[in-house]
UniProtKB/Swiss-Prot annotation:
Compartment(s) where it occurs, according to its Swiss-Prot or TrEMBL record: Plastid, Chloroplast
Gene, per the UniProt record: RPL12-2
Pfam family, one: Ribosomal_L12
Classification via HAMAP family: Ribosomal_bL12 (MF_00368)
CDD domains registered for this protein in UniProt: Ribosomal_L7_L12 (cd00387)
Molecular function GO terms recorded: mRNA binding; structural constituent of ribosome
Tagged with keyword Ubl conjugation: no
Family statement drawn from the similarity comment of this UniProt entry: Belongs to the bacterial ribosomal protein bL12 family.
Domain of life: Eukaryota
Name of this chain's protein: Large ribosomal subunit protein bL12cy
GO cellular component, one term: ribonucleoprotein complex
Organism: Secale cereale
Keywords annotated in UniProt: Chloroplast, Plastid, Ribonucleoprotein, Ribosomal protein, Transit peptide
Gene Ontology terms: biological process: translation
InterPro entries: Ribosomal_bL12, Ribosomal_bL12_C, Ribosomal_bL12_C/ClpS-like, Ribosomal_bL12_oligo, Ribosomal_bL12_oligo_N_sf
Amino acid sequence: MASTTFSSAFSILSLPSSSPSPPPWAPRTLPVANRRRRAAAVASTVTESPKVLELGDAIAGLTLEEARNLVDHLQERLCVSAASFPPAAAGLRAAAVEEAPVEQTEFDVVIEEVPSSARIATIKIVRALTNLALKEAKDLIEGLPKKLKEAVSKDEAEEAKKQLEGVGAKVSIA
């Protein structure tokens, strides 16, 4: 049965190219000007043999029934199936998943500036938040801007910011 469908599917391919008009059962095609533009666009990007172009035009002119028969025949002849190929939409869905914005779960608390009148109070808060020694907390305050805490939760970062801004420090969460 496949050979009969194959012969009917390729009957359009065996038509002489010099026929003045297509048979009445042939599908409607694009106007000649559009085909020429399309062929020129293809020819400008890839150099193809006239045989390939003729075959491509013939396949493009197939009806849906003939195209389905052609696919069935080629699958049988080449021993492949449509199931052996991954679906094209899977790649699009994967790209859409990658583009989804990732919500930040870890934050850094950065001390931007400490006024000189609030240095002692800020050092006390820094020591309470980080368990640093007095000298290390003082060194942290002197070389600003510096990260006070890294990779903490949003609640913990907001709480540290609130305490530091309460004593007069300028703090940002990154």
